[in-house]
Amino acid sequence: IGHVAHGKSTLCKVLTGVDPIKFAAEKVNNITIKLGFANAKIFECKDCAAPKNYFSQKSSSPDQPPCPTCKGTHTQLLRHISIIDCPGHHDYMTTMLSGVAAMDGTLLLISAEQRCPQEQTREHFQAIQATGQKKIIIAQNKIDLVTEQQAQNNYQEIQAFVHGISDINVVPISAIQNLNIDYILKHLVETITPPRRNLKAHPRFTIIRS
């Protein structure tokens, strides 16, 4: 989730290998309008040091692929996840809220290029707080487009924005440059743990897009 044009769909594509922007109107306007979906597998390499030991691949990948860093085969599947790419534009707030209802955790993107918080940054964060969502990671995106001082100032603004809320990790990244994506994967594994499921209960489906 996050403000419009802060890099949500780009990060989703980097993590999953799938472009969540599917519809013609989205491609023309370069914004997410409907909820986007993509699946991915997160792996750990037993031979590489953290955080380089974390990597992700498409959902169709084998459960023990070679490590892209060391090319070794001592890898382990840690998570098989689904990502919901929510629109950031104010006009599609209702669509975003329907996506939040199905989430086990939240990845909030904030662009280092702009002051924090932007309008939809605030609205989206308030929405996940209203649902009682506690598993939150913040990605400070686009750090490749600002100076080190600008990135530090923006980081401090983010910290002030979430002040008083414990256990929220802020990870500086550049989605388009694939910078610090391994840290994002590490925090996804450690922060957004799978909820307990009653596999003997009757199945229940939540329809969030038709």
Curated annotation (Swiss-Prot):
Gene Ontology molecular function: any one: translation initiation factor activity
Residue ranges of the region described as G4: 141-144
Catalyzed chemical reaction(s): GTP + H2O = GDP + phosphate + H(+)
Region (G5): 174-176
Cell location: Cytoplasm, Cytosol
The UniProt record lists the keyword Transit peptide: no
Region G1: start-end pairs: 2-9
Primary location class: cytoplasm
CC terms in the record's Gene Ontology section: cytosol; eukaryotic translation initiation factor 2 complex
SUPFAM superfamilies (UniProt xref): P-loop containing nucleoside triphosphate hydrolases
Chain segments carrying region G2: 30-34
Disulfide pattern: none
Presence of keyword Nucleotide-binding: yes
Keywords: Cytoplasm, GTP-binding, Hydrolase, Initiation factor, Nucleotide-binding, Protein biosynthesis
EC number annotated for this UniProt entry: 3.6.5.3
Region (G3): 85-88
Annotated positions binding GTP: A5, H6, G7, K8, S9, T10, N141, K142, I143, D144, S174, A175, I176
GO BP term, pick one: cytoplasmic translational initiation
Sequence similarity: Belongs to the TRAFAC class translation factor GTPase superfamily. Classic translation factor GTPase family. EIF2G subfamily.
Subunit structure: Eukaryotic translation initiation factor 2 eIF2 is a heterotrimeric complex composed of an alpha, a beta and a gamma subunit. The factors eIF-1, eIF-2, eIF-3, TIF5/eIF-5 and methionyl-tRNAi form a multifactor complex (MFC) that may bind to the 40S ribosome.
Protein name: Eukaryotic translation initiation factor 2 subunit gamma
